[in-house]
Amino acid sequence: VGLDRVGEALSELQVLFETSGYPLQGTIQQNWLLPTALGAIRPTCLAPLTMLAGDLTSHDPMLIVGFTQFHDFYPRLVADNLESQGFIARELNLDIPALLNSHLVSSMSLARLFDTPEFRRSVAQAILPRLGSAQRVGFPAVLGIQHPLEVLLDLEQQIGVPVFEIPGLPPSIPGIRLHNLLVKTIQASGGQVYSGMQVLSSEITAGKITSVVSEAAARTKHHYAHHYILASGGFLGGGSTADEAGYAQETIFNLPVIAPANRSDWFNPKYSSPGGQPIFQAGIVVDPQLAPVDPHKEPLIANLSVIGGALAGFDPLH
């Protein structure tokens, strides 16, 4: 694949999302340093425009805003941990009238409310008297589903300082935005997207996949294509399994998974070990074209590419 091709792919992705109204900004030459919902620093080369005002290469004072009825984001935790790292941050928990009748509010509910001008106005009016010396305001990543840039710009205009999102627990609203845009793009190109199906198995003839078999509502369906991409993840995503003896394999095409043979070697004694956890680095070995190969580098399936968490050496947690 190579760094150049990765850069080209990311540039194409940026063009796609720019034209779709949800820009991803950055380059592979330099990372943004963005705050997490724990107040830690998360490096990333590309990020939605809605998150960029939170870049921690700037030391502008921050106000971290949460909502009393939204229990998946704790502004004090974010602010305290940022303060401990030398940043200036205060927390603010809001009681907005539209939320007072709710004991618990979900991220989806909040995002839908932020899509309405009335809710944004009430939030801005609650923040302004308590803005103080803050030069930017951070929210949980719930600033609308349909038109996040419109929500962002409206809040910035009303509050008078830059606004940014901080991603947190699933369901991820930024992830839903990305998913929706990608689905629309695939469908506009003539593709089909199936939701609620589980791919169970495959049919392979002479080293080539002839179909994959999915199931939904107790009905199976065969899917035919010239080429297939495996993006089912590793052990965490259910794309790989292992038996009690330690033998690991991928679940759809029964591809061999490279993992420590001894189960006692799957984990390091320290959770935060610099080397990560060996079992989460387990995966499928591929050639330079991402086609799966066996331990002797011999090709296994000609019309299959493996990507993401299913790849050997990729550690989603480290």
Per-segment meaning from a language model:
Residues V1-E8, V15-H318:
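Residues forming the flavin
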